[in-house]
A protein has these predicted regions:
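Conserved beta-strand positions in repeat-built beta-propeller and related beta-rich domains
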Residues: 63-69, 106-112, 150-156, 193-199, ...
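Blade/loop signatures of beta-propeller domains
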Residues: 25-38
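A short loop-to-beta-strand structural motif that recurs across blades of beta-propeller domains
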Residues: 72-75, 114-118, 158-162, 202-205, ...
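Blade-level signature of beta-propeller repeat domains, shared across WD40, Kelch, NHL, RCC1
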Residues: 311-357
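Short loop/turn segments that connect beta-strands within beta-propeller blades
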Residues: 77-81, 120-124, 164-168, 207-211, ...
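Beta-strand-rich domains and repeat architectures in extracellular enzymes and scaffolds
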Residues: 41-71
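Beta-rich, blade/repeat-based domains predominating
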Residues: 48-60, 91-103, 134-147, 177-196, ...
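A short beta-strand motif characteristic of beta-propeller blades
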Residues: 41-45, 84-87, 127-131, 169-175, ...
Length: 357
């Protein structure tokens, strides 16, 4: 296995509104946003204080979610509102990210227990795969590639890994940048995994054959947390620290940043992309949390408030018909956003619920 290399690309473009004096930047408001015409429905998680963390789309269209503090996975039937919970194997495993495979199994990261698990929804049986390195104690965001290989980030362990579901073999690669905190992840049209380095101002990609890591430098102070990949393979990410939406062109290294409507303290977090190419994310630093839609064609924003307040939407997942699933951690709810999105192109969503495998 090749060792990781750092080949930062630093071409950067910033929208004019980012050039603010240091004394005025903190108080600056974000750009004006239009009213977002969506319907948001929410359901209570049956187990109290479960902390629903990530949502995912099941093969049958159901809303799956992790219950990080209850050690369960949950399934919502959006048509009936019925919720079923599935207890997991290892106590206090801290289920975090999750994703469905082509057979309908639900794979999740055991963020507190150094493992990846697979739930068979038909039987409730759980199969676990322990990390081969004790330093890889907190697997984070999982995503399948088109070959059916499960890729994942390891946040505190500062690694990226791959798991072959057929053999159970796990390979890990260390990120060269110290304390990079690998976070959100996605796969582009060429099968190349990209990921956020939340501990620094970088994005990165990993070669699926050699495991070589190449990093892309973002503007100073940026902290990318979640990401999605558009049909043109440009990478959109939320800048949690400074309140921006960002876009990286991996071919040229050019980065463009837009201030989020909620301003520099809006803490953009969970995100997804719908089949019409619209980028969606939530602002966790405003109360109530917002659902924000960004139109890449017009570079315009629209927003709506989450009825329950949201309590921090840590991730989002888009269905094939343009609906959005959300998990509202702090208020112990899961939600559905009806967007009326119309497909225009095949979209590769770089979140934990993508079904491209």
């Amino acid at each position: 296995m090749k060792s990781a290399k750092v080949l930062p690309l630093i071409a950067v473009t910033l929208s004019a509104s980012l050039f603010l004096a240091a004394g005025s930047q903190k108080a600056a408001a974000g750009p004006a946003a239009g009213k977002l015409n969506v319907k948001i429905m929410e359901w209570d998680v049956p187990t109290a204080k479960a902390r629903p963390h990530d949502p995912a789309v099941g093969r049958d269209g159901a809303l799956w979610f992790t219950e990080q503090l209850a050690n369960k996975l949950g399934r919502l039937d959006p048509a009936t509102g019925a919720i079923r919970e599935f207890p997991l194997k290892t106590p206090n495993s801290g289920p975090h990210g999750l994703v469905a495979d082509r057979d309908g199994n639900i794979w999740y990261t055991g963020n507190y227990a150094g493992l990846i698990g697979k739930l068979d929804p038909r039987t409730g049986a759980v199969t676990e795969y322990k990390m081969p390195d004790p330093l890889a104690s907190d697997p984070h965001t999982p995503v399948f590639d088109v070959q059916g290989i499960l890729w994942f980030t390891v946040q505190g362990g500062n690694m990226v890994g791959r798991l072959d579901p057929h053999s159970g073999k796990i390979e890990l690669q260390k990120v060269a940048t110290k304390d990079a905190l690998p976070y959100g992840m996605g796969i582009n049209s060429k099968g190349i995994p990209f990921f956020c380095e939340f501990g620094t101002n970088k994005m990165a990609k990993i070669d699926p054959k050699t495991m070589e890591i190449i990093e892309f430098t973002l503007p100073e102070g940026t902290r990318p947390r979640r990401m999605v990949i558009a049909p043109d393979d440009k990478v959109y990410f939320t800048d949690f620290e400074q309140g921006h939406l960002g876009r990286l062109d991996p071919v040229t290294g050019v980065v463009k940043m837009w201030p989020s409507p909620g301003g520099p303290n809006s803490s953009p977090y969970g995100m997804t992309i719908t089949p019409d190419g619209m980028v969606w994310y939530s602002e966790a630093g405003v109360n109530p949390n917002t659902i924000v839609r960004f139109d890449p064609r017009t570079e315009s924003f629209s927003e709506a408030k989450i009825p329950s307040g949201g309590g921090v939407v840590r991730n989002m997942a888009a269905t094939s018909d343009g609906r959005i699933y959300i998990a509202c951690s702090g208020v112990n709810k899961i939600g559905l956003v009806e967007t009326n999105a119309k497909p225009q192109a095949q979209v590769r969503a770089g979140h934990s619920s993508q079904l491209s495998n």
